[in-house]
């Protein structure tokens, strides 16, 4: 096929003129000359394909050129089919061939005919001589070459060698006198180079697609397949053709020849130090060195990438490889979440430098690669100045607490220091910076702590078992929705589904917040360990009315809720949920973090009181310079049960206000956050409040130290029964008052405070979670402490707690004589009475079961149409749809 016959095929279907480089290709892949397209737009004011009538939305100038057409035209110009006048390179080649009569006489007619037909000549050991030679790629021998092993081509100086193909940059395969063989490049002078090869690439790995419907645009191939490159799609993908299929494929899976390399670099901006003709790969590196030994040369000739012609295959430095760096891939069809995590964009880890995780007797150590930040969340980049080991802090080793641990809270520890020492004698870790710097550098804590909200049974060896309420430290989130982390109870590392857990950590909202490290440990059985800072500090408070001056005191330990959990490398609290609680209590306490709105602070006082018991072991809380005083110190009593209570800590550096006259209350873990409003409102525990044995709790959650030992022992037995879950006896209900308001009145000294909860106060916002709903009100109840009224946050309780029999709202309107000296004013919290008109079955633990005719005291009406209130029938507080009730 000559040039004219080929060009006749490259004509515009509209005007039948020959196409040139200005031709445009439409989205339907039909190509027309630019002049015809402009004429169509000018006459019809729109552009439709003349062949398929497809409407084109873009202008003619915006349409792309046909790259294959451009390359074909360039190839025709660079390689004329007929000898050009004036003695070009082809003419010189022909004259040189004619001057060598012996060489001309020995050329192969079969090779010449196949070359004239545009076909690749067949390699054979011997060809009969012919008379004429067209313009074939050829070279002139500069030196004699005898060949050193079978397969080498022998020639003499001055011989004209017909070039068949280029093995690599140092070797050619050619023909002299009808004999084919290999010869070195530096022994010849190229007279006419080989034609430019088509843009092709060789597959280095298998590329498979799992979902053929979703990935129908992908072009699957096997290793060593040769693909024709069409164009570059984006930074990491190219379009190509294999057999009769066209699709896209990842650039890093293939090795390009020089023509394909130029095509790939067509739209990419030039980078200094990178040659567009270079192609770097592991396969090419084996054939770039000069021939130094027979073994090396033979290996190069037999195993080179012979199907492609490489113009320049010198190895590039790794920094110049950009996105086309070839690395061992992970198959897209892989279902292993750990394998999929390698190509995850969320992981932030390079395949060549994954994080190393070691488990030893010293605990969990995660070492990030030096050049890649470890990421575990939406912004999941660890600061460079803090190592990953520091982020794990006191989790070395993350084992269950040993028996007989003394849990202390040292409020006098400098803010920002990490003092969550384990019972094995681990001392406080030194602080790496001030609290302000920590809050500034780490707006979100690392690593992420998650709590299991559903149980999960592992199906593979690398999966972790999830138990409801168990805590996990997540240090990698895979793209397929799986998490990689470690159980904070068993210390095992593995993967688990991300939708089975809920995050615990939250962003630090107060940069100047002072953190007081606290460690509260259990004694026996299995504990759930989590890392959290507590907030305390500020001026010491004094009690007004009983003349008690502020001084350090010792109060029983408190099991704090999991609703306020943070993991900061500089300020942590190692908190253990002890085995003295029932399993449901511990899980409910941890489960609160799943749905707890952590930006809405609340406070809590548990509703069950216990008397001074000789069998309760103390977990001391030292509040140096920050605690409230008490008229007498709390006795330290040995025993096997850890007495726990819920305490509230002010976010704005308010002190822990707990009386030390007697142990505090309740084995039940409330769902309150460990923070109050930023204005410094706290829940103050007042000493010296006498209570009756039937009393469920006092307004401030402390117990009297003046009861006889008989009552104390009786109360102790009841507490142990509650802790073990053996007690199912319900306390008598208190009938609701005539008035729906929640108000604490001052009365005679003989009447104790009754009811499950003291004054109801509005928290910072709506708050809903499984198993507990706080009671909101419209007006605050203030308590005068140290001459100033401290506004309290709302008390709330879990509907599933052991004290659920005691109604919490509305409490009976009876006087509390013990509050007389300290309460200067009390304001009612307004509630609205509603009647249930349609029964409503609850859909979750946070919702109330409504029966037709029930009376509900509504505390808050939300914007979404849901109400929060207390059911008069059983005293439970929760959410329910407002359309099921009517106001009375």
Swiss-Prot record:
Any GO BP annotation: negative regulation of apoptotic process
Pfam families: SH3_1, SH3_9, zf-C3HC4_2
SMART domains linked to this entry: RING, SH3
Regions of compositional bias (Polar residues) in chain numbering: 108-127, 305-321, 520-535, 692-704
Start and end residues of each stretch annotated as Interaction with AKT2: 440-543
Domain of life: Eukaryota
Modified-residue entries (Phosphoserine), positions: 304, 532, 735
EC number: 2.3.2.27
Biased composition (Basic and acidic residues): 707-718
Post-translational modification remark: Phosphorylated at Ser-304 by AKT1 and AKT2. When phosphorylated, it has reduced ability to bind Rac. Autoubiquitinated. Ubiquitinated by SH3RF2, leading to proteasome-mediated degradation.
Coiled-coil blocks: none
Zn finger intervals (RING-type): 12-53
Record's catalysed reaction(s): S-ubiquitinyl-[E2 ubiquitin-conjugating enzyme]-L-cysteine + [acceptor protein]-L-lysine = [E2 ubiquitin-conjugating enzyme]-L-cysteine + N(6)-ubiquitinyl-[acceptor protein]-L-lysine
Subcellular location: Cytoplasm, Perinuclear region; Cell projection, Lamellipodium; Golgi apparatus, trans-Golgi network
GO cellular component assignments: cytosol; Golgi apparatus; lamellipodium; perinuclear region of cytoplasm
Domain SH3: 134-193, 196-259, 445-506, 829-888
Pathway annotation: Protein modification; protein ubiquitination
GO molecular function, one term: ubiquitin protein ligase activity
SUPFAM superfamilies (UniProt xref): RING/U-box, SH3-domain
Region (Interaction with RAC1): 292-362
Family classification: Belongs to the SH3RF family.
Domain remarks in the Swiss-Prot or TrEMBL record: The RING finger domain is required for ubiquitin ligase activity and autoubiquitination.
Function: Has E3 ubiquitin-protein ligase activity. In the absence of an external substrate, it can catalyze self-ubiquitination. Stimulates ubiquitination of potassium channel KCNJ1, enhancing it's dynamin-dependent and clathrin-independent endocytosis. Acts as a scaffold protein that coordinates with MAPK8IP1/JIP1 in organizing different components of the JNK pathway, including RAC1 or RAC2, MAP3K11/MLK3 or MAP3K7/TAK1, MAP2K7/MKK7, MAPK8/JNK1 and/or MAPK9/JNK2 into a functional multiprotein complex to ensure the effective activation of the JNK signaling pathway. (Microbial infection) Plays an essential role in the targeting of HIV-1 Gag to the plasma membrane, this function is dependent on it's RING domain, and hence it's E3 ligase activity.
Quaternary structure, from the entry: Interacts with RAC1; in a GTP-dependent manner. Interacts with MAP3K10/MLK2 and MAP3K11/MLK3. Interacts with MAPK8IP; this interaction leads to the PJAC complex (POSH-JIP or SH3RF1/MAPK8IP apoptotic complex) with a 1:1 ratio. Interacts with SIAH1. Interacts with HERP1. Probably part of a signaling complex that may contain SH3RF1, MAPK8IP, DLK1, MAP2K4/MKK4, MAP2K7/MKK7, MAPK8/JNK1, MAPK9/JNK2, AKT1 and AKT2. Found in a complex with RAC2, MAP3K7/TAK1, MAP2K7/MKK7, MAPK8IP1/JIP1, MAPK8/JNK1 and MAPK9/JNK2. Found in a complex with RAC1, MAP3K11/MLK3, MAP2K7/MKK7, MAPK8IP1/JIP1 and MAPK8/JNK1.
Protein name, UniProt field: E3 ubiquitin-protein ligase SH3RF1
Species name: Homo sapiens
């Amino acid at each position: 096929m000559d040039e004219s016959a080929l060009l006749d095929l490259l004509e515009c279907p509209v005007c039948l003129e020959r196409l040139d480089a200005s031709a445009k290709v439409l989205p339907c892949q039909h190509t027309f000359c630019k002049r015809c397209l402009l004429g169509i737009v000018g006459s019809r004011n729109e552009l439709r394909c003349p062949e398929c009538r497809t409407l084109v939305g873009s202008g003619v100038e915006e349409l792309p050129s046909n790259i294959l057409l451009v390359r074909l035209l360039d190839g025709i110009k660079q390689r004329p089919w007929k000898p050009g006048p004036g003695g070009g390179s082809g003419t010189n080649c022909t004259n040189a061939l004619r001057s060598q009569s012996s060489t001309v006489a020995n050329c192969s007619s079969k090779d010449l005919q196949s070359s004239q037909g545009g076909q690749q000549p067949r390699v054979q050991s011997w060809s009969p001589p012919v008379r004429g030679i067209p313009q074939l790629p050829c070279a002139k021998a500069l030196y004699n070459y005898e060949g050193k092993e079978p397969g080498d081509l022998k020639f003499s100086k001055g011989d004209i060698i017909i070039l068949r193909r280029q093995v690599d940059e140092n070797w050619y395969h050619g023909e002299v006198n009808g004999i084919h063989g290999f010869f070195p490049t530096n022994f010849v002078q190229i007279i006419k180079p080989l034609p430019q090869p088509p843009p092709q690439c060789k597959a280095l790995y298998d590329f498979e697609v799992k979902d053929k419907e979703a990935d129908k645009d992908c072009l699957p191939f096997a290793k060593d397949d040769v693909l024709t490159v069409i164009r570059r799609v984006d930074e990491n993908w190219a379009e190509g053709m294999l057999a009769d299929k066209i699709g896209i494929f990842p650039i890093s899976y293939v090795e390009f020849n020089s023509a394909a390399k130029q095509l790939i670099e067509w739209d990419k901006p030039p980078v200094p130090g990178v040659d567009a003709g270079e192609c770097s790969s592991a396969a090419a590196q084996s054939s770039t060195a000069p021939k130094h030994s027979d073994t090396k040369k033979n290996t190069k000739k037999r195993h080179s990438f012979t199907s492609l012609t490489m113009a320049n295959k010198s190895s590039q430095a790794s920094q110049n490889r950009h996105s086309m760096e070839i690395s061992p891939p992970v198959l897209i069809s892989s279902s292993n979440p750990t394998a999929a995590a390698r190509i995850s964009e969320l992981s932030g880890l390079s395949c060549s430098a994954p994080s190393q995780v070691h488990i030893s007797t010293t605990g969990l150590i995660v070492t990030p690669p030096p050049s890649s930040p470890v990421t575990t969340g939406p912004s999941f980049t660890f600061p460079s100045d803090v190592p990953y080991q520091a982020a794990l802090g006191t989790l070395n080793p993350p084992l269950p607490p040993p028996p007989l641990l003394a849990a202390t809270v040292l409020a006098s520890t400098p803010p920002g220091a990490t003092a969550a020492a384990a019972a094995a004698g681990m001392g406080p870790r030194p602080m790496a910076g001030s609290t302000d710097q920590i809050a500034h550098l780490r707006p979100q804590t690392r690593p992420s702590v998650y709590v299991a909200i559903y149980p999960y049974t592992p199906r593979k060896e690398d999966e972790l078992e999830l138990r409801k309420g168990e805590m996990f430290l997540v240090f990698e989130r895979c793209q397929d929705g799986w998490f990689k982390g470690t159980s904070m109870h068993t210390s095992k590392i593995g993967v688990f589904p991300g939708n089975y857990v809920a995050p615990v950590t939250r962003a630090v909202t107060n940069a100047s917040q002072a953190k007081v490290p606290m460690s509260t440990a259990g004694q026996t059985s299995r504990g759930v360990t989590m890392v959290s800072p507590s907030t305390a500090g500020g001026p010491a408070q004094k009690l007004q009315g009983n003349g008690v001056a502020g001084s350090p005191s010792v109060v029983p330990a408190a099991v704090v809720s999991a609703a306020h959990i943070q993991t900061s490398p500089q300020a942590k609290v190692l908190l253990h949920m002890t085995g003295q609680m029932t399993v449901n209590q511990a899980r409910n306490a941890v489960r609160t973090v799943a749905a707890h709105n952590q930006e809405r602070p609340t406070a809590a006082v548990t509703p069950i009181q216990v008397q001074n018991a000789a069998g309760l072991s103390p977990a001391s809380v030292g509040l140096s310079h920050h605690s409230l005083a008490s008229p007498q110190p709390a006795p330290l009593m040995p025993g096997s049960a850890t007495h726990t209570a819920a305490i509230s800590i002010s976010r704005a550096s308010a002190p822990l206000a707990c009386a030390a006259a007697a142990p505090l209350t309740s084995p039940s873990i409330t769902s309150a956050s460990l923070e109050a409003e930023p204005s410094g409102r706290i829940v103050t525990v007042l000493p010296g409040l006498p209570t009756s044995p039937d009393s469920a709790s006092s307004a401030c959650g402390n117990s009297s130290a003046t009861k006889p030992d008989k009552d104390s022992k009786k109360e102790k037995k009841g507490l142990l029964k509650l802790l073990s879950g053996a007690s199912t006896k319900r306390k008598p209900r208190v009938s609701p008052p005539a008035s729906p308001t929640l108000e604490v009145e001052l009365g005679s000294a003989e009447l104790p405070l009754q009811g499950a909860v003291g004054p109801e106060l509005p928290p910072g916002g709506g708050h809903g979670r499984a198993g507990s709903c706080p009671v909101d009100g419209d007006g605050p109840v203030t308590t005068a402490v140290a001459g100033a009224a401290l506004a309290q946050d709302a008390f709330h309780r879990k509907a599933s707690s052991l004290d659920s029999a005691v109604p919490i709202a509305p409490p009976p309107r009876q006087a509390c004589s013990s509050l007389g000296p300290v309460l200067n004013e009390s304001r009612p919290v307004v509630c609205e009475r509603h009647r249930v008109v349609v029964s409503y079955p609850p859909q979750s633990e946070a919702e109330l079961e409504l029966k037709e005719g029930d009376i509900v005291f509504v505390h808050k009406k939300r914007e979404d149409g849901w109400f929060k209130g207390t059911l008069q029938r059983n005293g439970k507080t929760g959410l329910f749809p407002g359309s099921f009730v009517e106001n009375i």
